C-alpha cells in the first residue's frame, strides 16, 4: 500500500496525551500472523495516524482518531482490533459500525485480508439480506468480528440473534456521520452501546471531527486519547482542485460532456446532491452514448453490490452517485472527482474529493458553480483554508 510518505510525515497532530510514535509495525509487538497479514496486504511502514493510534488502541484505551481520507484509518483500527481479540475464543469480540452498507462490506474485507494468517472469523452485516441468511452464516462459520450498519446490527441484537456479552471493542467509523442528527444513527448507536459490557473499549474514527461530535462522544467514552489532525492539514495535498463557472444549472450538462470528451480518465466519480439528479444525469449521459453507472441509497442491495463490483474491478470507469459513496469507499484508480453539485454539508467536501488521490496518488477535483454557488464555494475555501483555482482552458493541464 503506497503512501505519499513525504507528505504523511509532515502532518501535524494535536493529541490529548504525549504519544509514543511507532516507526515500524515490528516495534508495535504485534502477533506474528497479523504482521504477515499487514505485509501481505501491501503495507511497508505505518502511516502518521497508524504510528500514533494503533498502540493506543492495543493498550485498551478509548481512542478518538481523526486523519485525512486515504491515510490508512481503516487499517489503523483493524490492526488494533485484531491484536486485541483472543483467537482461542469464538465469541463475538469486536464490533465495527459504519453509515453505509458498502463501507461496512469494505471494512469486512479489510478485516479478512489483514487477518488472513490468523484465521479470524469476520462477517459483514449490512442489511439487504435476510436475517436468516446472516444467522446461518454466523452459526456455520462462527464470528469474532462483525462489521455492519447500525440498524441491522441493533435489530439482530434486539432479537437476540447475536450475543454481545464478550464484545471488547466497539469502533465507530465515519463517526461524524454516525453521530450527527441528519441520518438518525445516533440513537441506534446509543442503544447498541447500552447492550455492550461496561468495560468495552470505544474507538471513534473519521476524516472530520466537529466540536459538536467531540462533545457527544463524552456520553459513552471514558477519558479518550484524542489524536486529531490540525485543521489546516486536512486539505488533501496532492489533489488539484478547480472550479468552472457554468452560470446556470442547465449548462452543467454540456460542460460535463466537454470535460468527458477532453480527458483521459482512469476512473471518475461524479457527485450529485439528490437521487433524482443521479438518475436523470445517468440517463442523459447514456442517451449521449457515454458509458456510465450510477448508485444511490434507494437502489436494492444486490444492484448496489453489482455497481460497486463493476467500478471496483474497473469494468466501468465513470460512477455517478450521491454522498452515499463519499464516505470511505476505497477504489485506488479514481483520478477525478466532479462535484456536479457542491455538497450541502461542508464536511462532505473533503470526503468527496478524497475519493481521488488515494494513498498519495495524484488526483483532480472539479467543482461546477452556478451563480448561487459562488458564496458556498467561498465558505468551503474558508473552512479548509484553501484556494480553489479556475479550471484552465487547456484541459491537458489538469493531468
Curated annotation (Swiss-Prot):
Sorted alphabetically, which InterPro entries does this protein's record hold?
DEAD/DEAH_box_helicase_dom (IPR011545), Helicase_ATP-bd (IPR014001), Helicase_C-like (IPR001650), P-loop_NTPase (IPR027417), RNA-helicase_DEAD-box_CS (IPR000629), RNA_helicase_DEAD_Q_motif (IPR014014)
* Gene source species: Candida glabrata (strain ATCC 2001 / BCRC 20586 / JCM 3761 / NBRC 0622 / NRRL Y-65 / CBS 138)
Q: Name one GO cellular component term.
A: small-subunit processome
Any one of the GO BP annotations? maturation of SSU-rRNA from tricistronic rRNA transcript (SSU-rRNA, 5.8S rRNA, LSU-rRNA)
Per the annotation, the residue ranges of the short sequence motif Q motif are 23-51
Write out the residues that bind ATP: 67-74
One Pfam family from the record = DEAD
Task: Extract the PANTHER family matched here.
Answer: ATP-DEPENDENT RNA HELICASE DBP3 (PTHR47958)
Q: Which SMART domains match?
A: DEXDc, HELICc
Query: What does it catalyze?
Result: ATP + H2O = ADP + phosphate + H(+)
Q: Tell me the function of this protein.
A: ATP-dependent RNA helicase involved in 40S ribosomal subunit biogenesis. Required for the processing and cleavage of 35S pre-rRNA at sites A0, A1, and A2, leading to mature 18S rRNA.
Q: Which family does it belong to?
A: Belongs to the DEAD box helicase family. DDX48/FAL1 subfamily.
Full protein name: ATP-dependent RNA helicase FAL1
Localization recorded for this chain is:
Nucleus, Nucleolus
PROSITE patterns attached to this UniProt entry: DEAD_ATP_HELICASE (PS00039), HELICASE_ATP_BIND_1 (PS51192), HELICASE_CTER (PS51194), Q_MOTIF (PS51195)
Superkingdom of the organism of origin: Eukaryota
Amino acid at each position: 500500500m503506497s503512501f505519499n510518505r513525504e507528505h504523511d510525515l509532515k502532518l501535524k497532530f494535536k493529541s490529548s496525551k504525549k504519544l509514543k510514535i511507532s516507526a515500524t509495525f515490528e516495534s508495535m509487538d504485534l502477533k506474528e500472523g497479523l504482521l504477515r497479514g499487514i505485509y501481505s496486504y501491501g503495507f511497508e511502514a505505518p502511516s502518521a495516524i497508524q504510528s500514533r493510534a494503533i498502540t493506543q488502541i492495543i493498550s485498551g484505551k478509548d481512542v478518538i482518531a481523526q486523519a485525512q481520507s486515504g491515510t490508512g484509518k481503516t487499517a489503523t483500527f483493524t490492526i488494533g482490533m485484531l491484536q486485541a481479540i483472543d483467537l482461542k475464543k469464538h465469541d463475538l469480540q469486536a464490533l465495527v459500525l459504519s453509515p453505509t452498507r458498502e463501507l461496512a462490506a469494505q471494512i469486512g474485507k479489510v478485516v479478512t485480508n489483514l487477518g488472513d494468517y490468523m484465521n479470524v472469523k469476520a462477517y459483514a452485516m449490512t442489511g439487504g439480506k435476510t436475517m436468516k441468511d446472516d444467522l446461518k452464516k454466523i452459526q456455520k462459520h462462527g464470528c469474532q468480528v462483525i462489521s455492519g450498519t447500525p440498524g441491522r446490527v441493533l435489530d439482530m441484537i434486539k432479537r437476540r440473534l447475536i450475543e454481545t456479552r464478550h464484545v471488547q471493542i466497539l469502533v465507530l467509523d465515519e463517526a461524524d456521520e454516525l453521530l450527527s442528527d441528519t441520518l438518525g444513527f445516533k440513537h441506534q448507536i446509543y442503544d447498541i452501546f447500552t447492550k455492550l459490557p461496561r468495560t468495552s473499549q470505544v474507538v471513534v474514527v473519521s476524516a472530520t471531527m466537529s466540536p459538536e461530535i467531540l462533545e457527544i462522544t463524552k456520553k459513552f467514552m471514558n477519558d479518550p486519547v484524542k489524536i486529531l489532525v490540525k485543521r489546516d492539514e486536512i486539505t488533501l495535498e496532492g489533489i488539484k482542485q478547480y472550479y468552472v463557472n457554468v452560470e446556470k444549472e442547465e449548462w452543467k450538462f454540456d460542460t460535463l460532456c466537454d470535460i468527458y470528451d477532453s480527458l483521459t480518465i482512469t476512473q471518475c466519480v461524479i457527485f450529485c446532491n439528490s437521487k433524482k439528479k443521479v438518475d436523470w444525469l445517468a440517463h442523459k449521459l447514456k442517451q449521449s452514448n457515454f458509458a456510465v453507472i450510477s448508485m444511490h441509497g434507494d437502489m436494492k442491495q444486490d444492484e448496489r453490490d453489482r455497481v460497486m463490483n463493476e467500478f471496483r474491478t474497473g469494468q466501468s470507469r465513470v460512477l455517478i452517485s450521491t454522498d452515499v459513496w463519499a464516505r470511505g469507499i476505497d477504489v485506488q484508480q479514481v483520478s477525478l472527482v466532479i462535484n456536479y453539485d457542491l455538497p450541502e454539508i461542508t464536511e462532505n467536501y473533503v470526503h468527496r474529493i478524497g475519493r481521488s488521490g488515494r494513498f498519495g496518488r495524484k488526483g483532480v477535483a472539479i467543482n461546477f458553480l452556478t451563480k448561487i454557488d459562488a458564496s458556498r464555494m467561498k465558505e468551503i475555501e474558508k473552512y479548509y483554508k484553501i484556494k480553489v483555482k479556475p479550471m484552465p482552458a487547456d484541459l491537458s493541464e489538469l493531468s
